[in-house]
């Protein structure tokens, strides 16, 4: 899957643009505030139905306009799929996929598997477990078709259980939720762990180039110590504690990935630049996995490619990007090193004051 064409109207400071993309590497060049990140944001919106910069649609729509419109053509093994998306400042949404209107923006995710890497991306490792669960679940979603309906059901059960915790007086009143919750939680955890075990060899291959001086260990934590007791036992034993805090304290919603160097979390050992390289290794490995195991092409959005990376690391990273068999969109402030890094593989777009031209 790759994005072959994008038409933009009234998105951020981009009033109008029609762009045909390289199936491999696309470099977006422009000074800060020019609109290069807005271009990546528009692509992200088409892939996930939301922005990575704000949750307010009004901030994405061009200042004096009422709505923005995005139209794209996505190439897959069966040909071209047209997708159109319009959102207004008032929140109204129109989505059309392959000629049919769709009500759910979540339907977009299956057509354009997107990975976003920003200068703040190191929070995947230094931030909360929620970030690492999202990373893991992105891969499981595309690898195992049963995962998404199972996880959606678990989230509904947890919402109902947490509401019931505030009302019930004995654990028996929660059994109606916990019986199904425990079965689905075991399935979800097995799906996550199986994917993680397949992914990590690809991560370690990339880390050998990116961070050769460090020996990094990895561990999947399912959300409870299943070697000690079952989730059913945890929920029973923690009933009064959970009732006091008002939510369920064990289960797949508490899962995490743990990366350590000599027993110490990587976020306490590595610099920000090194953490960024680690994140690149994780994301690129997911792209390789998607291509090798699931026969799908990943689309990478890399904002501020050279941030906190010396020329040697940029060269190593560029080599892995070229070999990733993914479609890449990279934003940079200056283009002087682009040919050195990517040769003739790329198409270069220049952005200034929201106007986009092709080199």
UniProtKB/Swiss-Prot annotation:
Its main location: cytoplasm. GO terms for molecular function: ATP binding; single-stranded DNA binding. ATP binds at residues 30-37. GO terms for biological process: DNA replication; DNA synthesis involved in DNA repair; double-strand break repair; SOS response. One of its GO terms (cellular component) is cytoplasm. Keywords: ATP-binding, Cytoplasm, DNA damage, DNA repair, DNA replication, DNA-binding, Nucleotide-binding, SOS response. Pfam families: SMC_N (PF02463). It is found in: Cytoplasm. SUPFAM superfamilies: P-loop containing nucleoside triphosphate hydrolases. It comes from the Bacteria. InterPro entries: DNA-binding_RecF, DNA-binding_RecF_CS, P-loop_NTPase, RecF/RecN/SMC_N, RecF_2. Belongs to the RecF family. NCBIfam families: recf. The RecF protein is involved in DNA metabolism; it is required for DNA replication and normal SOS inducibility. RecF binds preferentially to single-stranded, linear DNA. It also seems to bind ATP. This is DNA replication and repair protein RecF. It comes from Psychromonas ingrahamii (strain DSM 17664 / CCUG 51855 / 37). The gene is recF.
């Amino acid at each position: 899957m790759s994005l072959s064409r994008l038409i933009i109207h009234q998105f951020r400071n981009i009033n109008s643009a029609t762009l045909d993309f390289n199936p491999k590497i696309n470099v977006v060049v422009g000074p800060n505030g020019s609109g290069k990140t807005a271009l990546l944001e528009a692509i992200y919106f088409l892939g996930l139905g939301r922005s990575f910069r704000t949750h307010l649609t009004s901030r994405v729509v061009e200042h004096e306009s009422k709505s923005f419109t995005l139209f794209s053509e996505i190439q897959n093994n069966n040909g071209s799929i047209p997708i159109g998306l319009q959102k207004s400042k008032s929140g109204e949404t129109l989505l059309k996929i392959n000629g049919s209107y769709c009500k759910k923006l979540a339907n977009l995710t299956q057509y354009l598997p997107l990975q976003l890497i920003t200068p703040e991306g190191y929070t995947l490792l230094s931030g909360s477990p929620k970030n690492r669960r999202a990373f893991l679940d992105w891969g499981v979603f595309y690898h195992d078709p049963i995962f998404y309906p199972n996880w959606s059901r678990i989230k509904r059960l947890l919402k109902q259980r947490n509401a019931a915790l505030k009302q019930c007086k004995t654990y028996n009143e929660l059994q109606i939720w916990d019986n199904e919750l425990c079965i689905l939680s075991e399935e979800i955890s097995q799906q996550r762990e199986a994917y993680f075990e397949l992914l990590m060899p690809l991560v370690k291959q990339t880390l050998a180039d990116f961070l050769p001086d460090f020996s990094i260990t990895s561990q999947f934590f399912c959300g409870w110590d299943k070697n000690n007791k079952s989730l059913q036992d945890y929920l029973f034993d923690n009933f009064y504690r959970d009732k006091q805090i008002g939510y369920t304290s064990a289960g797949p919603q508490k899962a995490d990935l743990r990366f350590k160097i000599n027993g110490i979390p990587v976020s306490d050992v590595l610099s920000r630049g090194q953490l960024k390289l680690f994140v690149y290794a994780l994301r690129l490995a997911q792209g390789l996995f998607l291509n090798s195991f699931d026969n799908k092409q990943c689309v990478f959005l890399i904002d501020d490619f050279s941030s906190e990376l010396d020329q040697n690391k940029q060269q190593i990273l560029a080599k892995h990007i070229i070999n990733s068999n993914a479609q890449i969109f990279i934003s940079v402030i200056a283009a002087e090193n682009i040919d050195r890094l990517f040769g003739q593989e790329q198409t270069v777009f220049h952005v200034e004051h929201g106007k986009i031209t092709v080199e």
